[in-house]
Design a protein with these regions (language model features):
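Active-site mouth loops of central-metabolism enzymes
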Residues: 84-95, 135
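Beta/alpha (TIM)-barrel catalytic core signal, keyed to glycine-rich beta->alpha loops juxtaposed to Asp/Glu
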Residues: 3-16, 120-276
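A short, structured active-site edge motif that brings together acidic residues
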Residues: 81, 85-88, 116-121
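Alpha-helix-loop-beta-strand connector modules within alpha/beta enzyme cores
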Residues: 67-78, 83, 141-156
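A general structural motif
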Residues: 76-82, 110-115, 158, 182
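Acidic (Asp/Glu)-rich catalytic clusters
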Residues: 68-78, 104-110, 175
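Alpha/beta catalytic barrel-like cores
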Residues: 1-81, 89-92, 251, 257-258, ...
Length: 276
């Protein structure tokens, strides 16, 4: 039995699995390139990994497939590093947050994470809905997810909360409603070079960092992972695209505190079996 057929056999018994790139900072080819978006970086990473290494047939603990050596923080004590993660949700589902946080803690062998930034799903539009009604509907979706992140802070699993692409109105709503305030708002400056003044003033008044990102919205996870799901490798068929689809994706980085050096960066994505 070839490794590819063994891989397919292992997949057949799973309802879900996770793919972990490992530390992508180990690839010089990626470090010297400039990517317009993080999606381009992830796609290039997968192309490089899957063209240079055969697909592993065996899954690690908790059905996680590691694509390269997970060299991240073994040379540092835990208090010497800072771990940040950003989770891209495909649905308004608390379980996706729980799974992403649990998976990263398992992969990095840590009990806690310093910063969790959440990228919320796009809200479905309703024809004829007023802006105020849309905002109220959005906030009802946000409440249970943000409440869950507050619980993660209370249990010391994460130290601080971040949000992504919140307008001034959205950020104000969260600041007024929740006890644990966001410390970061990830913003993408499409077509302009400065943050809207109202958002900047609100962030200054509440000590919220406005950090610029290059993540597309929504993150095109399924399109990127066609690279993985359509690997041929002697099987003469797509490996997993007929069986699985992606749900959440997380990106993490590990920083050395006193030196401001990123020692590791990687991606984890979850696949679930498609319903017939």
């Amino acid at each position: 039995m070839t490794y590819c057929h063994q891989f397919l056999s292992n997949l057949s018994s799973l309802t879900r699995f996770r793919l972990h790139t490992g530390n992508v900072n180990g690839y010089t080819q990626l470090k010297v390139r400039r990517f317009e978006t993080s999606a381009e970086e992830l796609s290039a990473c997968l192309d490089l990994q899957l063209s240079s290494n055969p697909i592993a047939a065996d899954f690690k603990e908790n059905s996680c497939l590691l694509l390269c050596d997970n060299d991240h923080m073994d040379n540092y004590e835990r208090d010497e590093i800072k771990i940040t993660m950003k989770v891209f949700l495909s649905a308004w589902d608390v379980q996706q947050i729980d799974q992403a946080v649990t998976s990263l803690k398992e992969q990095l062998k840590t009990k806690d994470i310093e910063v969790l930034i959440l990228s919320f799903p796009e809200l479905d539009l309703i024809d004829g809905e007023s802006e105020d009604d849309e905002h109220r509907r959005w906030f009802e979706k946000v409440k249970p997810l943000y409440t869950y992140m507050e619980k993660l802070v209370e249990t010391s699993e994460i130290a601080s909360i971040g949000v992504s692409d919140f307008s001034a109105r959205q950020l104000k709503e969260v600041l007024e409603h929740f006890d644990v305030k966001p410390s970061i708002n990830h913003v993408r400056l499409d077509g302009c070079c400065q943050v809207p003044p109202e958002l900047q003033a609100l962030a200054n008044d509440h000590d919220v960092q406005l950090l610029v990102h290059n993540d597309p919205t929504p993150f095109p996870t399924n399109n990127i992972f066609k690279t993985f799901c359509e690997i041929d490798s002697g099987c003469q068929k797509a490996v997993c695209s007929p069986l699985f689809e992606t749900t959440w994706l997380s990106r993490y980085s590990v920083w050395v505190r006193k030196r401001s050096i990123m020692t590791s960066k990687g991606y984890i994505v979850q696949f679930i079996r498609k319903h017939d």
